[in-house]
């Protein structure tokens, strides 16, 4: 075999295979060029999902006539000279236009702001024609026809028109979020698919653009991010834990204005929500990272979708810290979508067979019992109300079954304070849900989910302050596991001991439990060990020690919290409400489920046709 130089056209086709995978990639490259040209209006038109026709026009600075040939030549660019480490533009390689022209029919028409007329140049299968005079407004128009007509085999890998159009809209949305001051529009065969008017280039304008794209639910459930560490600045918005999604498509990350899909950034977001969202759910977050260009390498992927940071630990720590602080500042807030879904679930149906139905038990003839709030529990914050030296057991014993004369309905005095965020307890229904009233709303609390969060936060506070005390089991328990699971769990033996959980090997595939945390009282050691073993493999590295410890705390909290089906006295319900108000991240349990739902009085009145 003879080694020979490849032709320029073949080189461009190879480059196109790396950069241009589908119509969305073509539009991405052209839109980024328009942004680099300081355009404030970008219009995109497509036919058949972009496979037959693409047109991108802008009102940017334009390209002079004598530079049009260079613009469609490989590795010709005005964006860098000799410093690849200091890239300040979205595009920089000079590959996009020649790559597109090698696999499609490309026509570029451009006019500078001070020119009398426009000029156009064409590239068909790598062959350049022109430039020649043309008529056009200041700016640039790029038309691409018959994508991949030179390489028909590539067309076999194209998806349906609808799928390609969906990929294009998703790509434009990602870019539009980062540039709210630019007007974007997308049309297909004379039909407008989406249009985003320009807004102010500030935080408020950014939130307005995000709301245009993400929907009206985003703003009331979002929390602003603003943090800085060394030379790195983080801004953007993240959402309440209970406002989550089943996939990560609603996570957007930008580095110096460039949309990226980086595992480090996704991992940092997941780590920040690790104890607030279920593992199969994903937070809704939009983050912008600005740092010196020399501190990030954007030239590590053909499509520039991945980046490499000089100090990844700094970036991860900044993201996790900023989100934790934002969630903490949010305090007792919950997502509005749960309330809306509850309202939607209400259906008005006439009650049938009222005459034949058995009359319900009436509480009117029964004595009412006032709420006797325990001042010490209401006024103390979480760390003080739970004496860790005596454990959580006294707190749990306080939440015991009520006396026989305690009724489900609670009479409150006229002077009872309703200005607490979660109000005053009024009733417990189905032995699991607490009904409370505020000045302008009704709140339903899941007592198990809420108490699970309280116990979890108490465990974490205790863990990071000092090792937890343990209690010896009178009869040690033997838990049978697979040999692999047992070996994996035993590698975390020292970490588990910090929680007061003492385990030892007991033959192949068996774990001997000698000690359990004293603060949890009596727990099901068998179930606890099996749950821990199921997850231990994922955290089987020293780098994830904190994640492992947090997971252990979450699992223990779940196994020791107040269970559904447990009756509570009025004072216990109110004490639980006050604890929720004092506890961080209390709007969700450790698994991401909501701990309470609020129905505004206006919504209730609307249900009954009063508004």
From Swiss-Prot:
The keyword Ion transport does not apply. One of its GO terms (biological process) is mismatch repair. It comes from the Bacteria. InterPro entries: DNA_mismatch_repair_CS, DNA_mismatch_repair_MutL, DNA_mismatch_S5_2-like, HATPase_C_sf, MutL/Mlh/PMS, MutL/Mlh/Pms-like, MutL_C, MutL_C_dimsub. GO terms for molecular function: ATP binding; ATP hydrolysis activity; ATP-dependent DNA damage sensor activity; mismatched DNA binding. GO terms for cellular component: mismatch repair complex. Keywords: DNA damage, DNA repair. Transmembrane segments: none annotated. This protein is involved in the repair of mismatches in DNA. It is required for dam-dependent methyl-directed DNA mismatch repair. May act as a 'molecular matchmaker', a protein that promotes the formation of a stable complex between two or more DNA-binding proteins in an ATP-dependent manner without itself being part of a final effector complex. NCBIfam families: mutl (TIGR00585), PRK00095.2-4 (NF000953). HAMAP family: DNA_mis_repair (MF_00149). Belongs to the DNA mismatch repair MutL/HexB family. This is DNA mismatch repair protein MutL. The gene is mutL.
């Amino acid at each position: 075999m003879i080694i020979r130089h490849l032709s320029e056209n073949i080189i461009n086709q190879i480059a196109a295979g790396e950069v241009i995978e589908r119509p969305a990639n073509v539009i991405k490259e052209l839109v980024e060029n328009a942004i680099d040209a300081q355009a404030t209006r970008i219009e995109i038109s497509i036919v058949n999902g972009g496979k037959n026709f693409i047109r991108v026009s802008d009102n940017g600075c334009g390209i002079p006539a004598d530079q049009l040939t260079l613009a469609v030549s490989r590795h010709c660019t005005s964006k860098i000279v000799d410093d690849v480490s200091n890239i300040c533009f979205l595009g920089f390689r000079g590959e996009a236009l020649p790559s597109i022209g090698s696999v499609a029919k490309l026509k570029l028409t451009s006019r500078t702001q001070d020119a009398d007329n426009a000029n156009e140049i064409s590239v068909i299968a790598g062959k350049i024609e022109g430039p020649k005079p043309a008529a056009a407004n200041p700016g640039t128009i790029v038309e691409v026809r018959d994508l991949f007509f030179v390489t028909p085999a590539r067309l076999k890998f194209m998806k349906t028109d609808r799928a390609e159009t969906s990929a294009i809209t998703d790509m434009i949305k990602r870019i539009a979020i980062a540039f709210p001051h630019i007007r974007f529009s997308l049309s297909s065969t004379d039909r407008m698919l989406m249009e985003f008017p320009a807004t102010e280039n500030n935080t408020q304008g950014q939130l307005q653009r995000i709301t245009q794209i993400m929907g009206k639910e985003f703003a009331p459930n979002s929390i602003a991010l603003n943090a800085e560490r060394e030379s790195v600045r983080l801004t953007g918005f993240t959402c309440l834990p209970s406002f989550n999604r089943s996939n990560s498509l609603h996570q957007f990350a930008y580095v110096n204005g460039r949309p990226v899909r980086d595992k480090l950034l996704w991992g940092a977001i997941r780590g920040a929500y690790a104890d607030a969202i279920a593992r199969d759910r994903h937070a809704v977050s939009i983050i912008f990272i600005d740092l010196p260009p020399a501190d990030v390498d954007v030239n590590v992927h053909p499509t520039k979708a991945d980046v490499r940071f000089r100090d990844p630990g700094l970036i991860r720590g900044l993201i996790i810290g900023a989100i934790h602080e934002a969630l903490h500042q949010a305090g007792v807030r919950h997502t509005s979508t749960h309330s809306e879904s509850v309202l939607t679930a209400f259906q008005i149906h006439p009650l049938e067979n009222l005459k034949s139905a058995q009359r319900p038990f009436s509480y009117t003839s029964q004595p009412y019992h006032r709420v006797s709030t325990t001042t010490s529990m209401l006024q103390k914050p979480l760390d003080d109300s739970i004496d860790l030296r005596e454990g959580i057991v006294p707190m749990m014993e306080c939440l015991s079954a009520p006396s026989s004369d305690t009724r489900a309905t609670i009479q409150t005095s006229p002077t009872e304070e309703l200005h607490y965020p979660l109000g005053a307890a009024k009733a417990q229904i189905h032995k699991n849900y607490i009904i409370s009233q505020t000045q302008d709303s009704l709140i339903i609390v899941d007592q198990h989910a809420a108490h699970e969060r309280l116990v979890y936060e108490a465990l974490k506070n205790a863990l990071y302050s000092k090792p937890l005390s343990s209690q010896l089991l009178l009869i040690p328990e033997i838990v049978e596991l697979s040999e692999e699971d047992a070996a994996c769990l035993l590698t975390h033996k020292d970490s588990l001991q910090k929680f007061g959980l003492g385990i030892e090997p007991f033959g192949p595939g068996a774990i001997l439990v000698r000690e359990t945390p004293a603060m949890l009282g009596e727990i099901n050691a068998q179930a606890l060990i099996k749950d821990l073993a199921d997850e231990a493999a994922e955290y089987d590295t020293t780098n994830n020690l904190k994640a492992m410890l947090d997971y252990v705390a979450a699992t223990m909290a779940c196994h020791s919290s107040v269970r559904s089906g447990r009756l509570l006295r009025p004072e216990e319900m109110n004490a639980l409400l006050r604890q929720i108000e004092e506890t961080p991240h209390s709007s969700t349990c450790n698994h991401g489920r909501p701990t309470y739902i609020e129905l505004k009085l206006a919504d209730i009145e609307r249900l009954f046709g009063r508004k």
